[in-house]
Each structure stands twice: as structure tokens, then as C-alpha cells.
From Swiss-Prot:
The keyword rRNA-binding does not apply. Binds 1 Mg(2+) ion per subunit. The lineage of its organism: Bacteria, Bacillati, Bacillota, Clostridia, Eubacteriales. This is Thiamine-phosphate synthase. One of its GO terms (cellular component) is cytoplasm. It comes from Clostridium perfringens (strain SM101 / Type A). Condenses 4-methyl-5-(beta-hydroxyethyl)thiazole monophosphate (THZ-P) and 2-methyl-4-amino-5-hydroxymethyl pyrimidine pyrophosphate (HMP-PP) to form thiamine monophosphate (TMP).
Amino acid sequence: MSNKDYKKLYLVTDYRIPFNELLEKTKEALIGGVSIVQYRAKNKETKEMCKEARALKKLCDEFGALFLVNDRIDVALAVKAHGVHIGQDDMDVSIAREIMPKDAIIGVTVHNKEEALKAIKDGADNLGVGALFSTNSKDDATLMTLETLREIKSVSNIPLYGIGGITPYNLNKDILENLDGVAVISALLNSDNIREKSKEFLNILSK
């Protein structure tokens, strides 16, 4: 298996954690092997978001990790993020593709095959698929069935990242064979040992 074939561990930040603490937690996750960080912040002023995103981008650069911004293309551009992640209620992928640099990564959350096909057609680089399990990070998350995940996998030629309530203990072979990695919030950031928890995830992802 080459490096590019390894399933990736993707950290999504939690805006409920004080930022200085979040920065330290993110560093531990990067040391543990996280290779993608998505900055997600709700109800914050743009100036504060840019300051936080810039600090996280610098940290990701130190570890050679990709840094993405959730929803806010303006913030992503301001801090020279590697890309953005957008949801179904955000800007169309085709418009985001026009605004972002040509080499920018655009990830899109999808919930079914139809949304996946549209995102791919419009120029998405990867898809977040879920929620695979119940999650405290998003109140309105609808659970995705294994059948739907397989349908999305069957029509996708870009990486799929599982999202929603994922832990090292609920990932099974049926789920993993349809994913290129997993995106995690609570299972990492609420861990007593983030570095070791990251390694635990990667050990499961490498099997």
C-alpha cells in the first residue's frame, strides 16, 4: 500500500472549546497523525475567525497537513487555506470553484446519491458522507444507511470521508470499505489523550 492509499484521519474543530485550548488539542492531533484539519466556527465575528484560522493554518503548515475552512470562502481566501468545505445549504460548488484558486480543495457534505452526483459534476474534490452515527455536534443530522453509503460510493470517483459520531469502536469493515477516511470532532477533541486516540484511529484505518 502506497502512502496515497492510506485512509486519512480528518479533524473538524469544535467552536465550543476556548481557542487557545483548541490550538493545543489540534497540535496533539497533528502529532498523532491527523492529515487534514477543517476549521468550523459558528456565530463568530469575521475578524476573530480570520485570526483563529490563520493560527491553525500556520500549525497545519508546520506538520504538512491540509487546512480547510468550513462554509466561509472569504475566510479561506484571507488566510490562504488549502480549501473549503461547504454544505447543501451553502454556496453552490460551481460558484465556489469560480471564486477559489484553481488548486484549492473543495469538499462538500452529501446525504444521498443525487447530491453526490451534483457535487461531483460541479467540481467537488471530496465528499463528506453522513451522518453515519448519532452526533452531538449537529442537532439536525440525519443518519445515513449503509445502503446509501454504498450507492454514493458506486457513483463517486473522488475521496469519501465519513462524518458524524465516529469513534474507533463503531467503525466496521462494511463502513470502512466504502470510505477514504473519517472526519472526527468529539472522539478526538474530548479524549484525555488526543495523540494516542489519533494513533488508535489510524491503526483501524490502516487495516
